Amino acid sequence: DDQTIWQRRTSIERYVSQLGIADVMPTTHLAFYTDTTYGMRYWTYISEELPKICREFFPQMSDKKEDNLAAGLSMGGYGAWKLGLGASETFGAAASLSGCLDIIEDVGRHLEGDSRDAALFRGIYGSLEQLEGSDNDLMALAKKLKTSGKPIPRLYSWCGTEDFLYEGNKRAWEYMKEHGIQEIIVHAPYIINLGNAV
């Protein structure tokens, strides 16, 4: 599936239609919202170009960060937090639904070897050394933002206790708490999918 699943399999259009909310659903394919080592500039597109284009096409869209939220499921949850932490001047909040929040543990282990996943993730991030501590590492990005003294967006995280990403979410939650970054955490005894997310 791709970003269109939200329109096809949820009621999101019905929810936002009466609220005056612009619901923008871009794709970065399998590139994890990253300017990849193979040259695709998905991060630049999603964090800089897309907001500008949307506001040019729809001038009534607010450019106030408090009016802009990034949200996503799974890889999109990682992308949402990355937008919140890495483009905090644009996004005032970020919501991750069963997101890949500990990229070092959840993806980093796939960077070694000759598997299809290893080739995919090396094409995105390069080596584990290049990934760890970079702006693609959400925990390093949070620390960088906190150190800068800039306002930190509201962070929301929802992950089922049976989800394979749950342990990574717990590590991210603990890290944020240790570093004084507030977030809203919801976890429940199931796996999150579109049927119970929206």
Regions found by a protein language model. Give the residues of each.
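Non-catalytic cap/lid and distal C-terminal segments of serine-dependent acyl enzymes
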Residues: D1-V198
